[in-house]
Swiss-Prot record:
It catalyses: 2-[(3S)-amino-3-carboxypropyl]-L-histidyl-[translation elongation factor 2] + 3 S-adenosyl-L-methionine = diphthine-[translation elongation factor 2] + 3 S-adenosyl-L-homocysteine + 3 H(+). PANTHER family: DIPHTHINE METHYL ESTER SYNTHASE, DIPHTHINE SYNTHASE. The gene is dphB. This is Diphthine synthase. Its EC number is 2.1.1.98. It comes from Pyrococcus horikoshii (strain ATCC 700860 / DSM 12428 / JCM 9974 / NBRC 100139 / OT-3). Belongs to the diphthine synthase family. It holds the Pfam family TP_methylase. It comes from the Archaea. Homodimer. The diphthine intermediate is not stable in vitro and readily eliminates the trimethylamino group. It is not known whether the elimination reaction also occurs physiologically.
Length: 265
């Protein structure tokens, strides 16, 4: 039989595509995970009501360590849907799951949905000018990750924008805000002193992408770090060299200071 990786989109249950909904309704079993992203505009109950089926929510451990024992045996005999926030294979974990399904002899298909990679277009930044992405992770104990700082540096040297995903600890209901991410980046700057991320760095904040009322703000770190961007999820973007249209958009739509029209272009 078949395993379907079905994207749920970005914000609420209405973001799933018609194709995804039709296939999910026909499946014998429906699983989902919500630890890779937050769909702030919906609930499990609303998704179940839309699909008309009970959904078993899998934990990170279920997905990463027990997928072969929980999902794949059922997919060998039945049609199974695995629902994921955003677009299914944007999360590298899900790509690995499809490899496992292939090796287990389970046929699989991917049903796409809105993704943060397309939604960032609402910031006015040109998609083709984004470089490598990175995740700003919460420090834990003696572990203080800094690789995202290096990604910003590498992209900036090429004039490219950096999309920063912000850490999620779904089991603890912890969703990093853009403010927390900026604070962490300033700490890393103090450690590395590379001039990559300072109070005068231009940043763009996008909150609740996919909703009807997203927050889109652009400005210098010193001006935005204390601003309230509303409920998560948030992402943080560090722009590279701006095209004049990008700069004008950030000024007119995202509230960036007009001086970026001559400084950053």
């Amino acid at each position: 039989m078949v395993l379907y990786f079905i994207g749920l989109g970005l914000y609420d249950e209405r973001d799933i595509t018609v194709k995804g909904l039709e296939i999910a309704k026909k499946c014998d079993y429906v699983f989902a995970e919500f630890y890779t992203s937050l769909m702030a505009g919906t609930t499990l109950g609303r998704i179940q009501k839309l699909i008309g089926k009970e959904i078993r929510v899998l934990s990170r451990e279920d997905v990463e360590l027990n997928f072969e024992n929980i999902v794949l045996p059922l997919a060998k005999e039945n049609d199974v849907a695995f629902l994921t926030p955003g677009d299914p294979l944007v999360a590298t974990t899900h790509a690995e799951l499809r490899i496992r399904a292939k090796r287990a002899g389970v046929e699989s298909y991917v049903i796409h949905a809105p993704s943060i990679y397309s939604a960032v277009g609402i910031t006015g930044l040109h998609i083709y000018k984004f470089g490598k992405s990175a995740t700003v992770a919460y420090p834990e104990g003696n572990w203080f990750p800094t690789s995202y700082y290096d990604v910003i540096k590498e992209n900036a040297e090429r004039g490219l924008h950096t999309l920063l995903f912000l850490d999620i600890k779904a089991e603890k209901r912890m969703y990093m805000t853009a403010n927390e991410a900026m604070e962490l980046l300033l700490k890393v700057e103090d450690m590395k002193k590379g001039g990559v991320f300072t109070d005068d760095t231009l940043v763009v904040v996008l909150a609740r992408a996919g909703s009807l009322n997203p927050t889109i703000r652009a400005g210098y770190v010193k001006d935005l770090i204390r601003e309230d961007f509303g409920d998560p999820p948030h992402i943080l973007i560090v722009p590279g060299k701006l095209h004049i249209v990008e700069a004008e958009y950030l000024v007119e739509i995202a509230g960036a200071p007009r001086e970026i029209l001559r400084v950053n272009v």
